[in-house]
Amino acid sequence: MTLTQFNLWIAEIRNDRTRGASELARRSLELLAEAARSLPATDAVELRERLLALAVALSAARPSMTPIQNLLRRWRETLQSSAAPNLAGARCLAAEQAELLMAASWRAVAECAAHTAELLGPGRTVLTHSLSSTVVETCRLLKDAGLRMIITESRPLEEGRQLAERLSAWNVPATYITDAQIGLFVAQADAVLVGADSVLADGAVVNKAGTYPLALAARDQGVPFYVCCERFKWRALDDPPPELEEMAPAELDTPNWPGVTVRNVYFDRTPARLVSAWITETGVHWPDAGP
């Protein structure tokens, strides 16, 4: 693996606008497994140092996405605490640990979705925003149980289209709306269900911009607002709040207006007081019991 390839991998994670936090975390682990097998090194110590540097760079590429940081931190800790007898053993250990964490992430998504599907039950209309792997899996579990969906387009790149396409293939009735229409449609839903890119220790949720006003609309109209995500997305009490990433204004496809500043902040923060329940792989967590 060359320095050019290394930089291309970092750029891939940094510039990805279509995959969610968990998917990018698993992709980062996949890249680390590939690097473990192919990265030039003279001995196990050099390999470990080069892999650790790559993991740190991948973690820093998407500061709003906690699962990348948490899963890669766990991988780094395993690498630092394990002593491989030789270079071949070090390669095998690093790759296997990355693959084990990828599998753990997939299991957590499946378990989280199972708890969410049980909470929602059959015959429900659910409104969602952006694209979440746990929400997609929940929809798959409920697709033959009378599920109806309301999907926001999720500008600027409209990742809601991907969910709409899947629901259409599953023959799940769905309504596709602009983000600006959430206040009009939230009352038609039995529940709002979103994923998360990060959850703070107090239960506040960092997710695609538009989640906060959706939570406000849901609270105003008496519709429960559920957040389903794996525990890998939760930040420790002493972790600083994640950066709310801002992307290129060009994504909004606006003219060059003199004196006008175009902003494209991708994430917002929804206070814990607006969350009806958090659903993780360990079950449903209600506010009275703490997040």
Located regions from the model:
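Alpha-helical scaffold segments in soluble metabolic enzymes
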Residues: 8, 12, 27-34, 53, ...
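Non-catalytic, soluble scaffold/interaction modules
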Residues: 53-83, 100-105, 242-256, 274, ...
